Amino acid sequence: MALWRSSDNLVYLPPTPVSKVLSTDDYVTRTNIYYYAGTSRLLTVGHPYFPIPKSSTNKADVPKVSAFQYRVFRVRLPDPNKFGLPDARIYNPDAERLVWACTGVEVGRGQPLGVGLSGHPLYNKLDDTENSNIAHGDIGQDSRDNISLDNKQTQLCIVGCTPPMGEHWGKGTPCRQNTQQGDCPPLELITAPIQDGDMVDTGFGAMDFAVLQANKSDVPLDICQSTCKYPDYLGMAAEPYGDSMFFYLRKEQLFARHFFNRAGVAGDTIPETLYIKGQGNGRDVIGSAVYSPTPSGSMISSEAQLFNKPYWLRRAQGHNNGICWANQLFVTVVDTTRSTNMTLCVSTDSSATYDASKFKEYLRHGEEYDLQFIFQLCKVTLTPDIMAYLHTMNNSLLEDWNFGLTLPPSTSLEDTYRFISSSAITCQKDASPTTKEDPYAKLNFWEVDLKDRFSLDLSQFPLGRKFLMQLGVGARSSVSVRKRPASTTRGSSAAKRKRAKK
């Protein structure tokens, strides 16, 4: 006899609805007022491989300045709500607030194109595995050699209103406790903000070389004790509010120039099922199978330059369509096509004959930048829904606009100390801070202040003229070409000539 029974499957419940993230175009109203802002010539000079400390202190006397470093500019903008506007009727200060929208940017780069070499005087190179004539496993105590190379070629520009995020491989936490000295450490993908001076991926991977390479000779000098970061494009593209990356420009290229293997004891033994043992001629013990190429960025040409040209932001990749929250903008730049390292030579003696020991050689690298922007004045209508949304997105935004949460007065008697930082009283941990803290105070950026560099005269600046030409409102020529009117007597004169022939 057949009996009906209910299904054993679990009941499907719909997922919890996700709170909708609004685009800035939904609550930001754009005006027809545009401003130009630009920096002066920004210069930096230093040693391309390492900082040079002072003899008395650990403070760097000559900083490390390399073309393979990130340049992260933190651009400070004036508060538009305290700005001298051409028309005070643009917005209602009781119900609206003004913000800046970045609509155009141009990153200018000076200095000629050039290739700067990197390397290590004690590079971990065992054999040339591309043109090897013998396979052996005899490894001496020290087979390091002086090797130089041209790194991977990278051009990069990221624009956003929060610092860009980078990723790299670091040392993770092992699950088992009985680890021994010499065991391979676990790897962990670490995400952290990209700061000014961080090293880019030069072709050896994005990783913490100071922790993961103990011999200090597997990579060139400029990164052997540094962390190379790669922009976390996936994370920034998936960011809910789209603040860290409005848009980005990227060009990378490299190829493997030389092929080496590493000296050292193989931590991972090759399984015997993968080869047949040899006899004699050094093949009874196989050599190192830890192969490593030296990268090369190949040819540099002015035809493939991302810089010194304007870019117009019409639609950002995220929900933030170019609005500069907190009146700041972060511009991240990498340009390895101008990586020339200048060699300086100073003589220590006035000898008439050449003696190499009488000359000192120095290395320096210099960089030149110029930032230009077009900002559009926008306004936000402060309805209760929009204020609640902005508070959820950034709780300090309303405080900057002089909106605070007023608590109801307390009916109980509370204690208020006069000197809250005094050692004579109990620690006042719950006391509110006297001054607002910068959320990026512990991060290193190249500070650029544009509070005094805004101008409405767009036609007086290079990027402003390009922007006006894009809008079709550029200055037209005052010389007009007038066409000569057609003659009205041509037909009658022709008829007269015909009659005259008769």
Curated annotation (Swiss-Prot):
This protein's record includes keyword Disulfide bond: yes
Principal cellular location given in the protein's record: virion
GO biological process: endocytosis involved in viral entry into host cell; virion attachment to host cell
Key words, A-Z: Capsid protein, Disulfide bond, Host nucleus, Host-virus interaction, Late protein, T=7 icosahedral capsid protein, Viral attachment to host cell, Viral penetration into host cytoplasm, Virion, Virus endocytosis by host, Virus entry into host cell
InterPro entries: Capsid_L1_Papillomavir, Capsid_L1_sf_Papillomavir, dsDNA_vir_gr_I_capsid
Subunit structure: Self-assembles into homopentamers. The capsid has an icosahedral symmetry and consists of 72 capsomers, with each capsomer being a pentamer of L1. Interacts with the minor capsid protein L2; this interaction is necessary for viral genome encapsidation. Interacts with protein E2; this interaction enhances E2-dependent replication and transcription activation.
Biological role: Forms an icosahedral capsid with a T=7 symmetry and a 50 nm diameter. The capsid is composed of 72 pentamers linked to each other by disulfide bonds and associated with L2 proteins. Binds to heparan sulfate proteoglycans on cell surface of basal layer keratinocytes to provide initial virion attachment. This binding mediates a conformational change in the virus capsid that facilitates efficient infection. The virion enters the host cell via endocytosis. During virus trafficking, L1 protein dissociates from the viral DNA and the genomic DNA is released to the host nucleus.
Record keyword Disulfide bond present: yes
GO cellular component term, pick one: T=7 icosahedral viral capsid
Family membership noted in the UniProt record: Belongs to the papillomaviridae L1 protein family.
Disordered as annotated region, ranges: 480-502
Compartment annotation: Virion; Host nucleus
UniProt superkingdom: Viruses
Gene Ontology MF annotations: structural molecule activity
Biological source species: Human papillomavirus 28
Protein name listed in UniProt: Major capsid protein L1
